[in-house]
């Protein structure tokens, strides 16, 4: 197994190269490394997939395989999952990298700048290392779960630790939410939780980064017609846990990855950890009323 230091060194190079690719596409410039300049978009499937997604996907996969040809892990990416996965069957891998080359494709295409790249190393269904790159902020978050260490890093190597807020009272907690993906059930749940202010941000990684900076405190995902996938959640969860925060189902159960179903369905609550138990308890009670039988 490569050392943590060796892995981080490769990750630093790959994420900043990925940032250069994405920023070039976002500005209609020629991407580096010979990727096609046209930002073509496929609107089929469960969401738009752009040439930028595919370029970063290829860059990350090639980079991992080149740097670690004999590493004891498998690689799973959002863009290759359909080819790799068989319904109901996990990959035969004790160690697994789960990659999302572009989380927040709609925000990327709309030019909000609120998109991210996710990389997570999962061991026996639980994340142990996470990376969330925010290209337009020129920031990358790293999280080492076992070491309980999370930090933000810039291109020049400057680091600062995660700084979760100290807010505890529900009425003081700041919610970070999507501009989209909101339905009546979620609105009723949020009304019952009676949180404080709300901040709208694109990308799960971008949302969790606001918790890591202490700007917000709570993120809630409530599945409906669709659900987030392993690649949406694994890296943000890893960094938040490494920072001392909390990320779980509303019944307190942990999120599991590579378990044969890439959907992360249910009510998922991420927070600064200060009021996680209270939030989970209230969410369970509320959902039992507004959506009986819903598996949290």
Model-derived segments and spans:
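N-terminal subdomain of lithium-sensitive/metallo-dependent phosphomonoesterases centered on the IMPase/IPPase/PAP
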Residues: 1-102, 188, 275, 288-296
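Conserved acidic residues
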Residues: 73, 94-96, 128, 173, ...
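Acidic active-site catalytic centers that drive phospho-/nucleotidyl reactions
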Residues: 53, 78, 100-103, 107, ...
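An extended, acidic
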Residues: 163-296
